[in-house]
Amino acid sequence: KLDEVSTGTGKVIPSLHEQVLQSLDGGILAELYVREGMQVKADQVVARLDPTISESNVGESSAKYRAALAESVRLHAEVTNTPLVFPQSLKLWPDLINSETLLYHSRRDQLTESEKEMNQSIGLVRRELGITEGLVKSGAASIVDVLRLQRQLADLNLKLTDLQTQYYVDARQQMAKADADVQSLAEVIKGRADTLDRLSIKSP
């Protein structure tokens, strides 16, 4: 006998002897395909549990997986300084693609603008240094001024290098996390999909 709500164990009575059926996950009985006294073949689907919760879990994990995958693709493009190209599997979610594309261009533009400002400052100091070196030769400026400008120029070059390095370090760290999320969520989806498949209860 199978109750209206199955908590994991039910019984059917074939023509030969009683068999015990078990569901690893349990749940609410949605459909019952056999009656007491019916002959049941091996591996025959005899009942199905309500898939609502399991389908919701699979859908939730799939959405997180797609988001992590899109982020991973963007970050790989940032780290390798290559065009952003999304896999075909994400083409059905244009909002997700648009969001990551906007973020990709925004981050690249911000880096480019910061580099531009830094290079302008470097150019100005380099020009001032050249003029000052000429004045030193004519005795109109002190060597101390040259040394000060050389230190300033070195500091600006170091800041430019740090700016670029930090951008790629951050991107690589985020990429590693996104890649790990993609892998772990793929396993979660696989497990939850298996749970969904087990909602169909079969005879032994």
Question: Language-model segments: which ranges?
Answer:
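Aromatic-capped interface at the extracytoplasmic side
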Residues: 1-15, 194-200
